Amino acid sequence: MKKILANRIQQHIKRIIHHDKVGFIPGMQGFFIIRKSINVINHISKLKNKNHMTISRDAEKAFDKTQHSFMIKILQKVDIAGTYLNIIKTIYDKPTANIVLNGEKLKAFPLRSGTRQGCPLSPLLFNIVLEVLATATREEKEINGIQIRKEEVKLSLFADDMILYIENPKDVTREVLELINEFGKVAGYEINAQKSLAFLYTNDGKSEREIKETLPFTTATKRIKYLGIYLPRKTKDLYAENYKTLIKAVKDDTNR
């Protein structure tokens, strides 16, 4: 039943989800946003005046914290209705869980958040919920993305893995955090600032130090791991950061 529901919603998911997001979307692949991130980093490195930042945001148990009531409201907002919506409501109507301690099942307790593990619907429902934050980020004029020709690039997303590309990080970071906090109050979404990593691009060390003082994120000096790929601060290091380490690992395995 849930697989049938997932197949049905996938027929309409591109109407709901922006092309910035690729995870669990028909015809979209993870390497699309890897290539996009590399292009953005390469573009920034060629700019004469640098005042930019890329942030890889680490969400805290994002699937587990999704609020059911908010999820249902968002499904209604994107015109999911009728029998389909009623079935999803039934799936998430007063779910409970038990803890088994020393072989004994303890009293059931209610679950008010979290998409169901292993359910083919879960990543699709999560995508729809997170699109609210993604849309708000795109539409927020105080958050400046990276201007590449006629397009302003702000986001890349794969499920809960998100990269944000911004200009004027000293002024914009507060707006980004406020937006996430407001979304988190209703959706249950939180980021782990200490595990989130950022590349800073400035023209001088003084500016970089001033920006670092305002950031709750860790600033990376060489690379950020995203979807299993090491994105280097400078694109010329792509080969060394990825292929050389992979070749060494293969050689070590074959020589054992």
Specify the residue positions occupied by each region the protein language model found.
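Nucleotidyl polymerases of mobile genetic elements and RNA viruses
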Residues: M1-R256
